[in-house]
Every structure is written in C-alpha cells, then in structure tokens.
C-alpha cells in the first residue's frame, strides 16, 4: 500500500513537471530531436530517435496524471495480497514505460519497442484474474493487436529498401499507407477490429480506466496525428466511412447493452470513431484536444463504475443500479458529471471540443452517408448517456437493502480527477488558440446540435422505459424471485461471518485444546513407557548378575 501511494505521488509530481515543460515549449515554439546511432550497416543507420515537443510532453502529462490517480484508487479497489499487488503495480509501470516509448518515438525502428510492449502488457493485464473468460478475452485482444504489429514489421521491411527508418513524403507508397492504417485501426479498435475492446473489459476496472479508455486505444489516433500529412486524400474518405460506421454501431449496441462496464466500453469505441472521423478531415489540433479531454472524463467514468461494482459484489447488470443516486450521492454526482461531459453539456469538459468538432463536420466536405452516420451516432451517444442518468436517479424497490459506506480513497481520487479535468480542459483549449472566425455556419446548422440532443433525450427515455418493463417482468424471473440478489446482499455477509467464526474461533479452539490434550497424553505415555523400559533393563541386569554369580560358584 505504501509503495503504491509513493508511486502515485511521485508520478503526479512528474506529470505536473511535464505540463510546465510542454507549456514552455509551446511558448518558445520549439521542438527537440535526440538521436542515438546504435549501429550502422552499409548505408542503413539504426538510430534511436526521440521527439520532444509540446504535444508529446502534454500527452505524457496526461498519461502520468491519470496513472497517478488510478494507482491511488487501486489501493482500495484492488484488495489483494502483497504478492499480487506487487505484480499489478509492476505490470502497470511496464505499461507506462511502453506508453512513454510510443509517445516519444518518431520513427518506426524506435516505435516498435513501445508498440509491442503495449500489446504484450495489455494481454497480461486482461488475463490478470486467471479465469477462462479472461484467457479467451486476452487471446482475442492480443491476436487482433498482432495484426497491427504485422503491419509495423512490414513497414520496417519496406523501409529498408529506401535506406531510412523515417517516413517522408518522397519515400511513401501505397503499401506503407495501408500498413499504417492497419496499425491505427487495430490499436484503436475500428471496424472490423472492434471486437477486442468490449472483451477486454474482463480486466480489472483500474486497468480498463487507464489502458482501455485513455492510453492504449488512443495510440492509433496519436500515430495518425503524427503521420496524417502523409496520407492520400482518397484514403481519408475511406477512413471517414469506417470511422463513422464504428461510431454508429457502437452507439447502437450501447443502447441495448445491459452490462454497465460494456456500456462504457462501447462509449469509448464510439468516441474513437468520432476522433478518427475528425482526423480524416485533417483537423489534427481538434483531434488532439478531444483526445486529451476524452481521456480525462472517460477514465473518470470507469473509476465511478468500478467503485459501484466494488460495492455491488462485482454485479455489472445495469438493472441493479436503480436509485444509486440516493445511496451514493457523491459518487453519482461525479458519474453524472462525466456522462454530461460525454454528451458535450455546455461549459463542462467535453463541450470545448465536441461542439466545435460537430460544427466542423457541417462546415467540411464529406460523403453524405458518412455525415448521416455521424449524426445518428451522436444521437445514440446522448441516448445511452441519458438512459444511464435515468437509471441512477430513479427509485427502485431494492435500493433500500443496498448500503455500504463509501470508500474515502476512491472518492478522493475521483474528486481530484474531476477537478483536474475541469481545469486542464479549459487550459488546453485556451492555449491552442483555435481560429473560430473561419467557421461561418447557417442558423440551421447551429441549431442542428440542439436538435440532435433533443432526439437523443427522447430515444434515451424510450430505451429506459423498455429496460424498466423488462426489469419488472423479465428480471423477476431471471433472478429467481430476487433470491440471488437477496443472497448476495443480505445473506452473504452473515454466512461469511458464521464461516469466519467457525474457522477462527470454534475450530481453532478445538484444535488448540485437542493439541494440548494430545501433548499431555503423549507425555504421560512417554513417561509410562520410559518407566517400563527402566524396569525391563533392571530386570535383565539383575538376571545377568545372578547368572554371573552362579557361573562363578559353579
């Protein structure tokens, strides 16, 4: 526990230092390259490059700050033995180092260290609980991510033909573009590689909060931000189509999903499609802003959901979370804040990027089919978000039998995360100096955002009514007349207390008394046996003496 607390505090201080350095580089408008020539073979130079600019340092600040809050959060959430806690901490630190290598690497030779490290350590974290479902989910995760690693290796093979590991305009061809897109699509879970992200929810919730919401899944987006100028315009249309379909289908599935953790996972998948579609237009600054803001409120959302699951005995069914606002008001307030940020509620975290991106969609030139997909996907985002708010704030019969005291460490880490997301999102938005005068939209497009929000609210209310109907009829049958729920919430603690009493009091006392009784009995038997042996020895000795005297006299 002390080790994790010290690690979290040190990383928080390091993240603050990285933020100051990024602001300093942004003020100077400078970039730094560090090159280390490892080996030279003919004309090929194996150089290890590091690119340090304000984007890379800002992303390092983001990853370090989220990591520090989640490590402090995990002290209470991951209630494990010391050995398992050390394994969890070391895996998370290895993941953080791999993420640093990915962020700072500008060429394909040095990026492979972070890229392969992310895939391998992500697999180790998904199978952390050592269950069969975790093993199958981890295998799907690593196999789909290995497809992107194959693309990276093929790019490195093609680049040996040109004599350089650095991508450039005059050394690009069609195959390299396809392989770069394959890398980005597999790591950021775009269609048809999007199945691994919901399956990766078998990992512990702190892992999902760090890995599968803010860092690993955004690695493909960050890669394309670096190399977006090398992509052809025709490929950008295909990227827009695939990303819009990802956003549409992820939002559609999230409206029918009853697993609370998977709802947040599909929400992450929808936002990844949203960022990828914006990247196809070419607005890298807006994408980086939304990547930064989305990482904060989505990790916060996972932390809130994980704390609910921690108190509900790992029950992830959304139908069991009715009325949680009245039981855990502080935690519910933080979760509603993150949900409203996801919807782009005015002057919250997501408003600064999402509203501007939607206006850029209407201002840009794209395929009508992609535009329709993005509009419907945005409506679905509001729909499942409003459904979650209705579930939390509604009253339900079983809410009165569920109560567990809120954990202070979890609440403090979530509250700090919410405050930091509010401050830093507005700070980054002001520092990027967007030229908003170039966006001149008609009033009908300005009002389109509010229309989408209203349609999403209506759809969310209808989905909520559908779940409520199924909750009254279907769940009553499924839970065996609520007996499973009553057992988990009421009987389980009593049975565990009885079991503890039997093991540690009754059985231990009996064992102690029986052991003492046996020891006394054995001592008595040993004493009797020793006395018997002495008598036997004396008898034999007397007999021998008598025999000796007899022989002498004879």
Curated annotation (Swiss-Prot):
Membrane-spanning segments: 6-26, 57-77, 93-113, 150-170, 175-197, 209-228, 238-258, 263-283, 286-306, 332-352, 379-399, 409-429, 441-461, 480-500, 532-552
Membrane topology note: Multi-pass membrane protein
Any one GO molecular-function label of the UniProt entry: NADH dehydrogenase (ubiquinone) activity
EC number, as in UniProt: 7.1.1.2
Keyword Transferase carried by entry: no
Reaction equations catalysed: a ubiquinone + NADH + 5 H(+)(in) = a ubiquinol + NAD(+) + 4 H(+)(out)
Chief site of localization: mitochondrion
Protein's UniProt name: NADH-ubiquinone oxidoreductase chain 5
Function field: Core subunit of the mitochondrial membrane respiratory chain NADH dehydrogenase (Complex I) that is believed to belong to the minimal assembly required for catalysis. Complex I functions in the transfer of electrons from NADH to the respiratory chain. The immediate electron acceptor for the enzyme is believed to be ubiquinone.
A single cellular component GO annotation: mitochondrial inner membrane
Lineage: superkingdom: Eukaryota
Pfam families attached to this UniProt entry: Proton_antipo_M (PF00361)
Enzyme class: translocase
Localisation per UniProt entry: Mitochondrion inner membrane
Coiled-coil portions: none
GO annotation terms (biological process): ATP synthesis coupled electron transport; electron transport coupled proton transport
Disulphides: none
Keywords linked to the UniProt accession: Electron transport, Membrane, Mitochondrion, Mitochondrion inner membrane, NAD, Respiratory chain, Translocase, Transmembrane, Transmembrane helix, Transport, Ubiquinone
UniProt key word Membrane: yes
